[in-house]
């Protein structure tokens, strides 16, 4: 699931991810995607030991912490605040049970609905709302593989 969250983060415009813990195989897989599909200077992947320290650093620097959770306020009720959010954003998505500390230290707990759902879907919808669909046209200059959109069929352009 973590790999899918990272792929969505990259494809939907996030500038990078922090991964709590070590997973060499997963990081290697993501770096391979970045090498082929681009984004090496745009999208950073960093393994960390303690997510709480990143949250505290982010707050000290004046950024905003968004925690995506089914227990938060509905994203539709948050819509008018998107223009007023202080950047940079740190978006927290958690697998399984997230510690209560994150709920209390996030600036906003936002739900993509109050039913059980995937972190992948929540992140995709949230980023799409922030970027208003512009992220769907994003291209990376250093991509070795690019898709040329087709009405029918598939066209892939390879370089390097």
Curated annotation (Swiss-Prot):
Reaction it catalyzes: cytidine(56) in tRNA + S-adenosyl-L-methionine = 2'-O-methylcytidine(56) in tRNA + S-adenosyl-L-homocysteine + H(+)
Signal peptide bounds: none
Keywords assigned: Cytoplasm, Methyltransferase, S-adenosyl-L-methionine, Transferase, tRNA processing
InterPro entries: Alpha/beta_knot_MTases (IPR029028), tRNA_m1G_MTases_N (IPR029026), tRNA_mtfrase_aTrm56 (IPR002845)
Entry's Gene Ontology cellular component terms: cytoplasm
Paired cysteines (S-S): none
Pfam annotation, one family: Trm56
Residues given in the record as S-adenosyl-L-methionine binding sites: 68, 94-98, 112-119
EC number: 2.1.1.206
GO BP terms in the entry: tRNA nucleoside ribose methylation
Keyword Methyltransferase listed: yes
Chief subcellular location: cytoplasm
Enzymatic class: transferase
Localization annotation: Cytoplasm
GO MF annotations, alphabetized: tRNA (cytidine(56)-2'-O)-methyltransferase activity
Family per record: Belongs to the aTrm56 family.
Protein role: Specifically catalyzes the AdoMet-dependent 2'-O-ribose methylation of cytidine at position 56 in tRNAs.
Subunit structure: Homodimer.
Protein's UniProt name: tRNA (cytidine(56)-2'-O)-methyltransferase
Organism of origin: Saccharolobus solfataricus (strain ATCC 35092 / DSM 1617 / JCM 11322 / P2)
């Amino acid at each position: 699931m973590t790999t899918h969250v990272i792929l969505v983060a990259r494809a939907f415009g996030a500038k990078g991810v922090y991964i709590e813990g070590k997973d060499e195989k997963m990081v290697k897989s993501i770096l391979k995607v970045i090498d082929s599909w681009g984004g090496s200077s745009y999208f950073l992947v960093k393994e960390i030991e303690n997510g709480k320290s990143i949250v505290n650093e982010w707050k000290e620097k004046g950024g905003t912490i968004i925690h995506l959770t089914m227990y938060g306020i509905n994203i539709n009720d948050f819509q008018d605040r998107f223009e007023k959010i202080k950047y940079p954003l740190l978006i927290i998505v958690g697998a399984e049970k997230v510690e209560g500390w994150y709920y209390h230290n996030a600036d906003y707990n936002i739900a993509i609905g109050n039913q059980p759902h995937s972190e992948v879907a929540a992140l995709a919808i949230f980023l799409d709302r922030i970027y208003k669909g512009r992220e769907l046209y994003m291209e990376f200059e250093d991509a070795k593989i690019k898709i040329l959109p087709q009405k029918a069929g598939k066209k892939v352009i390879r370089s390097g």
